[in-house]
Amino acid sequence: MHVNPEEITALAHAEAVAPRYDIYVLIHKALRAYMVDTLLAVGQLDVDDEAALAQAAQRVTELLAFCRSHLMHENQFIHPAMERHAAGSSQAIAADHVDHERAIDALGAVV
């Protein structure tokens, strides 16, 4: 995740306006919960238990598929809508998504 100090400063000094619905907050909260739940399962894994190992590998594979689907959805629907509203507004996020896709591919290669 990249933090832009100028954006943080602008937010801190922004005038109060009517709150906007944040389309990102709930899905990303759910994604973090899914990732943490999967991490806990992997962390508690007995690697000598072949059935448990297979189940954990399946959980990780399903998580990676969900994350990839989420990225594709944002790239296909959310980013174009952002760009229609404000040109260039999705560029930083699109770059993050490239990094996320590489990480998903790398993790998927070892599961």
Where are these regions (language model features)?
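Small-residue-biased structural context
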Residues: 1-111
